[in-house]
Each structure stands twice: as structure tokens, then as C-alpha cells.
Amino acid sequence: MGARRESGLHSFLNRKTPPTADMQQGSGGTRPQPFSRFTYGSKSAQSSGGMGGQVACSPKGRGSQRSLLSSNFPFMESVFEDRTAAPQRTPTPRDERSEYFGEAEGSSGLRSSLQCNRELASLDKINDAQARMVVVAGKSHLGLYKFDEAYRMQQVHDYMTPGSLGGGTKFSSSMRRNMRKISTISDVKAGFHHHKNYIAICGTSTSVSIYDINRASAKDSPLITTLSEHSRSINSVDFNMGQTHLLISGGQDGCIKVWDLRSHSYKVNRSDLNFNSGSDSVRDVKWMPTYDFASLGADTSLCSSGRSNKFASVHDSGLLLTFDMRQPNQVERKINAHSGPGLCMHWHPHMDYIISGGRDGKCALWYVGDKVNSMVSVPQGHNSATSYSINTAPITTGYLETVINTSHPVSKLKFRPKYVHNMLNSLIATSSMGEDSDVTIYSLARKHIPQNILTTAAPSLGFVWWNEDIVFNIDKQSVISAWDIRYEPTLLDNLPKGIVKWRDMDGSGLVFVAQEKGTYSMDNGGVTDSVGKGAANRMSNTTLNSTNNMGRDQEVFTYSFQQQYKHQDQEAADRESDHDKELEKERETEVDQHYHYLREQEREHHQEYQEWEHEPFGRHDDHQGNPQTDFYSHAYSDRPMLSKALSTYSSKIASPILSYYGAQTLSHHTSIVSNSPSISGAALEYPGGIESPIMITLDLPQVFGSVRASRLADRKTSKNKGNAPAVRESAVDIFKYLVRELELCHVQERNDPKSISVDDRSKSLDDTELKIQLMENIGLSEHNTWATLIRSTTSMDTNDPAGSHTQGHSKLVDMVKLQGSNILSPDNSDMEDDLGDKLDEMGTARLQENVNHLVGLIFLSTHNAETYASVNDLQNFKIWMLIRDSLLNDLKEAADGSTGRRDASGGAANSDKNGIYTTTSTVNHARQDSITSNFSSFEPSDISRSDGEEKLNLGRLSEQNLKATNQNTTAKLDDTRKLASSSSLNSSEPLLLLEGGNQAKEQSIGLSDLKTCLKERYTASNESVLDIEEESSATVAYSSKQANTECSSSIPIRKTEARTSFIDTIMTNLRSPGLSHLDVDNDAIFGKGKTSTSLGSGASKRSSMHSTDSYHKRPYSSPITYSKITTAAQKAKLGLADHDGLPNRGSISFLANIDAAHADKLLLGKLGLASSPDDGKLLPPWDTGRLIQQLYRYSVETGNIILTVCIILLFQTMYKVTSTRIVKSTLAEFITILHRYEMFEISAHLLKNCPWDDILGAGSGQSTVRLFCENCGKLIVNEHSKTILSKRHQAGESNMTNFGYWYCDSCRKPNSLCVYCEQPMKKLALSFLNCGHGGHFECLQQWFLDEGMSECPSGCSGVLL
């Protein structure tokens, strides 16, 4: 956009004929260079010795003393530019601008900028059209800057530097010292008319300094006087526009002082009027302006004498006060405008409106006209005292018309000095505190979208409207810039007409926004439409989540504008002069339409106005109470309120913006609906002509779910389970259902593995029954090794003393640490026997722990698979079945490991040390023979039943299947496994040395032992391997066939051949990815005439899946030494020449040329095995840890939140899925999502069972809860009572327990009572989201849990449980 803006501006500057006079080239034929946000063209400050005739002379003599409340004031023609003195830039409509702007619609409206070398704080314009000057004040700087027609600025004088005063004038040292020392400036203002050469500055000092800019060349000092009656720093100062001799100031001491520059009071530092607000600091004070709009076709009758007598102030407490000097003993209006400190305020140029800004980031527009006083009787007391306190003044009326919400505290705001017929067409410029470096211009007709944003390089410190189009601004980088808003692009110019965005989890789809851009102005048609539809609308006001809109009712709004427009339009119709004839023609249609509309509204509502005005204040049908309460309830309850969710409101005291008029006197327990009419379509809230945007949503999961459900409907052969819910239509409902039904965490994961005792005797009979049921489901017989182990460990837990296994395990670990590598030395045979016993004892204990954990994970995986099956999510169902199958394989290996360990410990005749280590190594090789395993015939994917219900068929393997296996074949298979384990480079000896803690001998046992072992065993076992494999394959195929036949009699299953598990189906290609790219010489391996026997018969899927070629490629069935090495790259890796062939079967001498580490890396890659970085173990592709890792990466890449959290919580402790930092961050974000969907019970369960305690604080400290009193509507702070109770507590009284936020210091009433016991809620309390009621935790526990109730105790209609 920046490039387009610069190119457009360049094309505009190079045009030959500019459209307006002031666009011509300035002196010297130069134009301002293009200006960027971060680069400023620094111009040298030029000083002149004198100001010539550009500045009017100072009045030489003072006039006679006049009354302070004089009603005569001059017209303010000097405020506006002299049209004859300088060419006026005529406003160019956007369609005309396109002729010379071309594509430069985004060109900047910045006219010029000037870098100053002094610190700046505030600025104002010199109210002389011919002067073309602004005054800028800062710390030790008070400069006067002049600009030309092209708004190029230069410094004229610096009144804090004596050298710049010119003429070689000599000053005394005291005078020079007074001039150079100046405090930090808070405000600077210039006078009007006869005092337009006066400048008043104020700051951190307690005085107001007044300078005369015409005394630049005089011998005396430009400092006229110093007003020092304030006791603290002064925040604001302002000159009166009508009575130009009046000056007003307000400071931190809470005093507002009025000074008359004609009298002698200011010479003795005594103010003429003093208004004391106590300790409430004054942040800003302004006189009511009296602009002269007569030359612009305005009604001069509005410029009455009363306007120059009024002023307003905004205070630290958020109060907005209006005063009238003719009644100095009282506050005209006292409005609680902001919930925090008020920072600034400004009057409308010609209407009775005030806009205020505060630290709460709100710009509130208030109507303070006389029409309010005509309907509200205000006591007219008279007192001769000129100083009084406003602390006792009651909160009075003030109509809030609209609120502009900003994201930063509003420090400066000013109305655009332009006459408008419609209040909504007024522009407001604002600047904020902090790092927001923009000056934002809003239109009241479009308060949510700014019209212009003047982007500056540093945060703005202040700005001023030079006229209705030019804005001067200063920032923290001491840069003065001039902007022309007519050439500044609006936000609507860059606003796309259609928007397509991705929705969040609430919809998980697309959202389309179609809208008309509209404009920033309000036409008459819009007023008619919006006001006419306000009377019929009603708004409900609930107790907790209520929406209340503030503003004046439509009748008062129309009536107040009637009186103004009736005179203005009539006067405008009668006036047609030469200089404004063109303007009157443009306004003629608008005036006629608006006038007729007001007449029609007046006739229509005249009777209603009379009844409303003359109705007694004390009479009201809906409210009972004292006259003051009824007055507020009647007069202002019909005013809509600003949106704010509060528990309740009161109508007795007018509260801040957050809880203003329209309050209800009834209790929130009985009052649900308000009788207040809503003017949601009123002119000040929703301008006409701007249609509301249309939002269209597309729920993609719902669409895809419907398509998937329609396609799967024809394939269903059975109905859903009886207890399974129907398919949800909403993605949010599915998310909530899955989170509630899935087992997200395992309870054992919460405990530290080091603190888990093996002999935990807390296991009940139910745990044993669950394990027996699992044995029956997976087909293990009662006499199986794992079943025997379960019974033995159960009885052992009952009889064995506590801590025996744990102590044995700790002793064994200590022994291994002390002995180190000497345990396996030949001289320690006795110690090896003891180590064998200890190893067996430790293995049994650890095996029991692993078995218990695996059993729990298997149950959880099965439950999660069933949950996904209930919602027809087949993809996640298969994932969890895949996890369960892998866990079942680990469970079987644990049982096989226990058998091998017992055989090794009981076989004393076997003197070979490799006997123990070989069995241990066999356990570490996960699923070495999955094809011959009985688990391979397990059918977890069969989810159908003959009875028509969709159910997970876990299958069964009978006891006869285990007995049918030939014992001789099993013995041969054991030898084959030993051979396979010893044939790999990761031999059993280095593996056990790593497990025993001796890593030093890993290098000593190298290729020599491996080559010797291979030479001795290969020749004798080469032929037997094939025979054993073929025999076992045929036996397993026959056994599987027989098992399916026998199981069909007891369990209704499909009559199909043996099917493969998910592991065999999905991971077939992952068996040996490295060997799949090598050509295997079958003749060299099996010999001539030998073929492999198929594992299945007939048309079985298993036989087609495991063909002879794929079967020979398995790493545990075909030795790697007999693969063909065909390519030169493969030969180079193995150290072979191109002419070298494969060695014969009896020789493996080529291995001597291969480095051990290189061979390990090469062969592990060819075998498709991964080496664990922690312990160096080999991990096959179907290893559970690798499977969990792959599923975790898949869930993260696809954005499956639930699957990711489940994997982390269930398997992080056992399989180390990812880093702990990522786990904690993921859980914290997931808990935030659960809180967003109000699933607090699931979140509490996760926090209770997760093993990371620091997750418990996730999301804390990020929310701010603000409590408002339901009686007075004010923010509950209770600082006063806290101070008192703290002092008493320090004195020895123990009464701090009474402090809390259950009461309000302002109204001295309890905030809310318990709905059960009707007592103040001092302790732990709960609140209902449905109805907003609350009560003590103990009371609600008794009501819902003990008494079994489901409704709210207050008797409301909501069912909570």
C-alpha cells in the first residue's frame, strides 16, 4: 500500500494543472517531499528579528472596569481565516479528486513536518487568521512557529532563549533566570480577539504564566504576569472565547479558579472566583465556546450571553462537572462519567454537548442542554459566597448519547470546529497515552470505524485544529506535523467489501461477511428511519448477563433538536447573500425535508409530551418508594443504557457509564424484564443508510460429516450400540462428547515411577477380575505363563511383607553400581549366581509393574476405540485399535520374557553365559516372529456381530491352540531365534554390558567374536533354518484354521478365513524398508530346487500378503550376508572392489574390512531397525514407542487436538513422546480450551492426574474480575474500610475477617445474599451461569447433593442440574 501511495502522490505532484489554487507551487518552485512514517525531513529553524505586521499590537491601555458577568461580547470573526488574505482551499469531493489523483487514493494527507531540537509538550494555534502561527511549549521552550500557504513551518521566536529576542537587548540576570527556568508544561493556550496576543502556560509548578507575543522586540520581558494561587501543579488552562478577558485554570489541588485580566486581583495573585472540589484533582477545564457561524449560514440566536458564562471540568474520580458563573454557589450538573479517572473533555462548537475521555478508554458524549433543566426542577439557591465545596452536591442529570470505545486511555480529544446541521456528522479527533502513535478521527455517525488515522512516528503529545481540515500535531520525537484530512485516505477506502475467514473451534468452518461500506455522514432519511422505529422496541434486562444501552429516549432527543433546528432552518431559509448563495442552494432540499419531518413528529407526539411533562414526579405505576427514587425511575428508566453486564442496577444514585440510568429498583430475584423501551434504532446509536453487515457461516465438519454419513449408511450391516449416542450435527457437540467420554489420562501416570511400590496391596478383587476377563478376551488359557504370573503376584502382594521387592531392587542396583564390570568377569562365578537370583527377583517385580501398566493402557485404548466407533469416526477408531494391538504385543513379550528368565535361572547345567543374555536379548527384540505368533490370528478389526449390533470383537484363542503347537518345532524356533540374535551386529554381549553399566567392554567384544560365532553355527544350521521355518509356518496356519473353527461355536463371528491384525496389515511395507530395495538371490540362499512354503492356503488374505518374496526379505529369516550387492556404491560402502563377488557360504572374511561402527549404521538401516539414543537398543518398525511417535507427529500435523493430548497424557511417561516443555505447553493450552467450553470438571480431572504439578497454575493471573455493587452500581474497592480495619488490627483487634468484597463502602449495604440462607457471602461462594444467582458452597452442597434438588433455590425457572 505504501508503494501505491507514493506512486500516486508522485503522479499527483507532477500534474501540470492542479485543481485548486493552494496546490500551486510555493516560493522557489519546490514542493514538499514525500513523507514516510519513520523519516522526517529536518528543516533548520529560521528566526527573524521582528514579526512585522503579521501580529496585532498589544492593547496599550486597559479599559474601564466592567462587570464580571458582562453580557456583551464581540463576534468571533477573528477566529476564522480571512478569505481575502490567503487563498482558501475549497473542499474537493471524492469523485472530483479522482480526476487528478488517479490511482493515488491512498496518498497521504501530510502537508509538512518540522524537526525541533527542543522537548515539546503542548501546542495551540494563534487565533489570528492573518498570522498563520502556532505556539508550542515544552520544558525550557516556548516557541512561536509560522507556516506559509503550503504549510511549511519555521520557528519565529523562542521566548525562553534571550538571544532569539533579537536587537541586542540586554536583560538583567534575574530576568534571564526567570525566563530560562520553566517547569514541565501541561497545557498552553492562546487568547482571543483583544487578547489574541496573549499566551498562558501551566505545568508542574503552581503558577500560570502569561506572555505577550508582541513584546519580542521590546526592551521589557514578554512575561506579563504570573498567577500563583494554586497549591499544587496545574493541569489545564483556557481563555474565554466570548469574554476574552477571563482565564480559567484547574489543578491537582482540586480547585478551579477564574481570573479577570482587567482587574487588579491577578496582580496580587488572587483569583476572582474559586470553585473547590476537595481532594478531587482537576484534569481538564474548558470554557463553553462561542464560535461565530453567522457568516456560514448559522443561527446567531444560539450565541447567547449565557454560553460564555459556562464551563466544565473533568476530574480524577471520573466526575464531569458543569458550572455557570451566574450561579457560583452550586454545580449545574454532576455526572459520573467514567469508571476511572477522567483525562480530558471538550465542548461541541455550537451545540450543548460535551465529550469526555478517560483512562477506561471511552469517549462519552453527553447532552447538557437547557431542555434537561426545563423538565427537571433544580433548586435555584442564591448565596453571596464566591467559594464553596461541591462534595455535597448530588449526582444530577446528564444524557449519555453515545460512547466510542478505544483500546488505550484517551489523553486528548477535540471537536472539529465546523458547523453541522446534524450532530452525528461531527468529527472528533483523539490521541492516546502509551505507545499508540496515532491521531484518530472519528465520526459520530460511524463510531466503530474511524474515518482517518494520522500515523505519526512517535506517540502523539497533543494536537490542534487550525481549521476544519488542517490538524497540527506534535509527538515525542519533537516533530511538528501538519495534516490535511481531505487528502488523507479513510479506513472505508481500504475496507474490503467481502471477507472470508476461517472460524475457530466454535464453528471449524468458513465465515463470509457481505457488507456495504456506507459513509461517515448522516442524511435526513436515515434520521427518519432510525427515530421512527424506536418506540415499539423493548429490551429485556436479565440479572447477570444483561445488556443495557444508555442514551436519551427518542422523544427527548427529537424535542431538543426541534427547538434548535426550527430556528436554524427558518433563519437559513430567509438569508440569501451573495457569498453564501451557493451554500444555501445545496442545503435547501435538506432543510425542507428535515423541517417537515420535525413538524410531523411534533404533531404526532405533542400530546405525549404534554402528559409526560406535567405528570407528577412522585407518581409511577411500576415503582414504589420515596419521591426521589420514583423521580429517577420515571424520568430516566426509559433511557436506554450502555452495554454492560452487571449483576443488578439501582436507580437511586446515578452511576458511571458502566451502570447508568435506566436502573431498576426491584430486586434481581424477582425482576427479570424491564419496562424500558429501547431505541436501538435511534439516530445516535445506529445511523441510517448504513446497512448492517451480513454474516454467512459454513460449518465444514457438518458438511463433511453429512456426506460421510450418507455414504456409510448403505454399508452399515448393523445398528449402532444401544448406549451409543447418535451422530452429532455440530462439531462442538462432538468435541464435548469426545472429551467427556474418552479416557484422556491414566491414573498411574500421575504417580512418580520411583515412588510406586511393587507390593502395593491396594489392589482389590475387581482388579484381578478385570485381568482375568482380559485374559479371556485375548485368548490366553488359565495355565498360561502370564496367567500363572498374575496369580502368583496377586498372592505375593497379599502375603509378602511390604517393601521386600523394592528393597531387593534397590540392593541390586547398589550392587551393580559397586561391582561395575567385574560382575561379569570369569573370577566371580559365585557372585554371578547371586546376581542371577537378584536379577530374577528384580525382573519379576519390574515385570509385574509393567504388566499392570500395560493392562490399564490396553483397557483405555479399547475404550477410546469404542468411543470413536460410536460417532462413526473410523479413522481414529483404527488408530486406537492399532495402539491396542501394539500394547497387546508388548504384553505377550512381557510374558515370554518371564518364561525365558525363569528357564535361565533354573537351568544350572547350562554353563554358557550366553544362555541368560540370549533370552534377555530375545525379549528386547519386539515381535521377532509375528507371523508365527498366535497373536497374528487375532482379529481386532472385526466390529460386526451376527445379532445386528456393531460391537468390537476382541476374539478368543483357546487353550487347545497353545497345546497344538509342536514342542519340537518350538525348540527349533528357539535355536533359530538365538542364531538370529547372535547373527546381528547388535550382539547380546554388548547389549548386556550396556544394561549392566559396563560400557567400557563394548569396544573389546568386536567383530572377532561375531565372525567366530557365525563360522561355527552357520554351516550346521543353514539347512535346518529353512526346514524349521517351513514346518512352523504350516503348523501355525493349521492351528489358526483350527482355532477359528473352534471359536465359531461359542462366539458369533463371520465365517471367513484367518485375518491379519492391524500391525500385519498396515506395517507390511515397514517390515524391512532397507531390504526392499535390494535384489535377493533366492538360489544362493535356498539352493536349487528349494521353494518356500506359503503361510496360508486357499484364497486367504494372509497368503497373498506374505508371498515367498516378501517372506524372504524379513530380517529374522534371511541372513543379510547373502544379499546381492550389485551397485558400485553399495560395494564401496562395504569396502569391495568392482571385480569382487559375493563370498561363499562358508566364508565371511569380507567383514574384516568393514569398520564396526560403519557396519552397525549400515546394517541397521538395511534392516529397518532404529537404535534408541538412550540405551543403544534396536527398535523394529512395529515397536510401540516408534508407533506412538509416528501417531503423535501425525496428530500434530493434522491438528487433532484430542488425539495429541491423549497420546501425551497416556504414553509420555512410558515412551517419552516429546519434550516436557512441549507437554506442559500443550496441556496448558488444552485446559484453556476446556475452560472456554465450560468443561471445568474435565479440566480439574486432568490437573489432578497429570504428573506435572506446575500445570496447576495454568491460566492463573490472566483474568481481572471487577465487582460492582448491585445497590449503587459503583465499583467495589472498600479501601476506606480496609484502612480502618488494618489500623485496628495493628492495635491488637482481630477483626480483619470481616473485611471483604461482600459489602460496599459507598452505600454501606451488602452486595448480594446467599439464595439459600439469605446471609452475606463472606466465604467460598458459587454462582450459577444460567440465572446469575449465587450462594455459599456449603449451602449449595446441601441443596443439590444432600437434598437432591436440581432447580435454583431462589425459585427461578432454570434447571441447573
From Swiss-Prot:
Keywords: Metal-binding, Repeat, Vacuole, WD repeat, Zinc, Zinc-finger. GO terms for cellular component: cytosol; GATOR2 complex; vacuolar membrane. Residues 39-48, 64-73, 958-971 have a biased composition (Polar residues). Residues 1-104, 564-593, 896-916, 953-982, 1091-1113 are annotated as: Disordered. Pfam families: WD40, zf-RING_16. Gene3D superfamilies: YVTN repeat-like/Quinoprotein amine dehydrogenase. It comes from the Eukaryota. Residues 566-593 have a biased composition (Basic and acidic residues). May be involved in a process influencing telomere capping. This is Restriction of telomere capping protein 1. It comes from Eremothecium gossypii (strain ATCC 10895 / CBS 109.51 / FGSC 9923 / NRRL Y-1056) (Yeast). The lineage of its organism: Eukaryota, Fungi, Dikarya, Ascomycota, Saccharomycotina. The gene is RTC1.
